Amino acid sequence: MTRQEFAHWQNKQTNNVSIDILPSAQNWLLLLTFDGAFYHGWQVQPDIPTIQDTLQKSIQRLTGETVRVNGAGRTDSGVHALNYTANFNSTAKNILTAEKWYSALNAVLPDDIVVKYVQSVPADFHARHNAIGKRYRYMICSQNYNSPFTKNKSWHVGQTLDLDIMRQAAEILKGKHDFSAFRSSNCSSLNTVKDIREISIGKSHFQNSIIQIEIEANSFLQHMVRIITGTLVEISQARISFADVKKALNNGDRNLVGCTAPAHGLYSLKVIYPDGLVNWPKKVIDN
């Protein structure tokens, strides 16, 4: 299905769809990958394309149901995902198995949103509320020209970065800290203390000019990964010092840390759940 065809059926009424209804709903968990370049983030917004809205309308097309798809968290416009989770409840009788949901959704979704796996989960499972951690990857392009193949998939810095200096700075950020200085001015989170479990920085196995920063934490503030990335880049450029980062963690001063890196370099890499709650086959998890 082309994007034009998808937009056409999105605007149609689905009130005439006839379906059988089960007495109780089944909770389904989706593992998704998507290119966020043409979407305004996850959450439904009036009259603009979002990932959540596209999924909900796809399910409505298949079953006639109006459902809410719960995502593992909000994403900004342009953010991508290699592994993102979302769940929804369905009472439709015409799609009863995970295999059928997998085939049906991939048949109607636009080609920049793909369902990688589907599994049934307990009725009280929620993709965001049950998560105990998340892992993100940020991609930086250091080559001196902006390649058309990485233009909307990475941040083009256009200069060589000192990865050793960046790794030393990352050590300061690891552990439990108040990350007030590393969040958007619009962030409304009441809990600004987060626990960064791991930060790794290295070059891509596929392209030497691509630098990958991976960050795992119990949860994140709005723009936190992007501001950490901007800070690590500016430390490599000698625009920010280690002392500035330490001060920012102590006093929450946003002016002491780096810029907010562009959204299009950010990828949702993994949503972490308690052992045994979600079991994805290893072959479907991208690294």
Predicted features along the sequence, with ranges:
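Structured-RNA-binding interfaces characteristic of tRNA pseudouridine synthases
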Residues: M1-N287
